[in-house]
């Protein structure tokens, strides 16, 4: 059980340090509480809004924090459930008479479901060869590679189903007969349709197979990416920003394990940096897409979906980013990452 003090963060900590601590604790909230006195809270959502306002990772977290947090007194603990539900928050601090945090009540601990429901279609890219997962994919198509007791594609669908999605379409090609057989025989509370790709068309090209069939905005996902996010909030963000496409991106922090040398003129050294640290956003391979994109796909064009987005961006269309924390993204596109995903899911059980 996590200790209250483990969720405290200093107001002078950087936003990057705060993100790391959120990842380390596995929580979505931290508290600015000098000597235990509650001053502010900081959530992954607060940080997301901060970045979208132009904030940077090296700024102190007090620039992103919420200094009007909700709380309950020790005698008001019984009101926690209704407050968590009414305000759709993940946690509520309990304060004594001196304003010191004595406990934290989590929504999941009270079995409070604050997820926003979103009933829109989900399209899954499931036709690739999965060459990075060879030799597994010599026997099984990537969507059917097991992670624990379920294939990865089924795990992904279950995550979307938890938020109200029940209409799935898989764009299939490689070993498509195995994929169809599995999902047709699976006992499930959602529908799965298939679009047959006769030649490999890239992660974007297969969308042309859905012309005339997609009438509403939809989630578009790889078959090897598992996100621990609020899909309802993502969809609301997409609508409120008026995006044609919203790309879900994860914050990544990477330390180069070597000294980096910048080359100057005539073989001279212009600069040296020992094990530099890099911070960037990376594409998770999950998107919210307007149906217009499908109708405007060129028949037979072989293209990756990031290139489709870039084409719209250059044309002046509104394409956006929904940032999430690194720990919210699990990718099994490579063997090493597949094993990491398995271990992480085992720890969550």
Provide a role label for each language-model segment.
Residues 106-139, 145:
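N-terminal nucleotide-binding beta1-loop-alpha1 segment
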Residues 1-21, 25, 31-34, 38-39, ...:
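Bateman/CBS regulatory modules and CBS-like beta-alpha motifs in cytosolic regions of diverse proteins
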Residues 218-219, 226, 232-239, 252-255, ...:
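Catalytic-core segments of class I nucleotidyltransferases/pyrophosphorylases
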Residues 28, 90, 166, 216, ...:
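Short acidic/polar active-site loop segments enriched in Thr and Asp
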Residues 241-251:
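A short, conserved acidic/glycine-rich loop-to-beta-strand motif
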